[in-house]
C-alpha cells in the first residue's frame, strides 16, 4: 500500500500508534526495492527498483528556521536549513541524471502541525516547489518522496492532509487492541 501511494504522491503519511510498525514498514519497503534493483532486468523494467537513500529528521526537534532557511542578521545573507539543503542537493543531482537510478526518501518522524508543515504545501501540490523566505524556489525532483511518520492527524490542517497519500496502520490488523 505504501509503495502504491508513493507512486502517485510526492508526500505520504504513515499514521498509527507508537510501536505499531510504521518505521518497519518503510524500512522493509526500502530494503526490498533496493535488493530488487540489483537485478538489472528488473531495474530496467521499473525505475522504482533501485537504491533508496533516506534522510530522517524530527521536525519538532529544531526551530523552523533550521528546517528551511535563516537570515544571518550580521552578514544579511540567507543560509539553507536542513530541509532546504537536502532538497537543493537533490535538485542539483537531478540535473545530472538521465534516468532514475536511485531514490531519496525524506522522512519526517514527528507530529504534523502548522508551525512547520504549512511551508511544505507548495512542495506537496502539483508545483512540487519549496518556496523559501529569500524568494528562491527549489524544484523537487521526481526521484524524491516525502514520508510523514505520525501518530495521528489531530493538529494537521485539511490543506496538508489533502495533498498527501495516506497509509493507516490499523491496530487490530497487526494484532493490537486500541485503548477504549
Regions found by a protein language model. Name each.
Residues 1-180:
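Conformational switch/transducer regions in large eukaryotic molecular machines and scaffolds
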Amino acid at each position: 500500500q505504501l509503495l502504491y501511494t508513493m507512486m502517485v504522491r510526492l508526500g505520504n503519511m504513515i499514521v498509527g500508534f507508537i510501536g505499531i510498525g510504521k518505521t518497519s514498514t518503510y524500512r522493509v519497503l526500502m530494503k526490498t526495492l533496493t535488493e530488487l534493483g540489483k537485478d538489472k532486468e528488473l531495474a530496467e523494467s521499473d525505475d522504482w527498483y533501485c537504491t533508496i537513500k533516506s534522510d530522517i529528521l524530527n521536525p519538532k526537534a529544531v526551530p523552523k528556521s533550521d528546517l528551511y532557511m535563516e537570515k544571518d542578521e550580521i552578514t544579511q545573507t540567507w543560509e539553507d536549513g536542513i530541509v532546504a539543503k537536502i532538497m537543493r542537493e537533490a535538485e542539483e543531482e537531478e540535473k545530472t541524471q538521465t534516468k532514475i537510478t536511485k531514490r531519496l526518501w525524506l522522512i519526517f518522524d514527528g507530529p504534523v502541525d502548522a508551525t512547520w508543515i504549512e511551508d511544505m504545501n507548495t512542495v506537496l501540490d502539483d508545483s512540487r516547489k519549496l518556496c523559501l523566505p529569500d524568494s528562491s524556489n527549489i524544484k523537487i525532483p521526481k526521484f524524491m518522496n516525502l514520508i510523514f511518520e505520525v501518530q495521528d492527524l489531530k493538529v494537521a490542517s485539511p490543506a496538508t492532509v489533502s495533498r498527501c497519500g495516506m497509509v493507516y496502520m490499523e491496530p487490530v490488523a497487526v494484532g493490537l487492541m486500541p485503548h477504549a
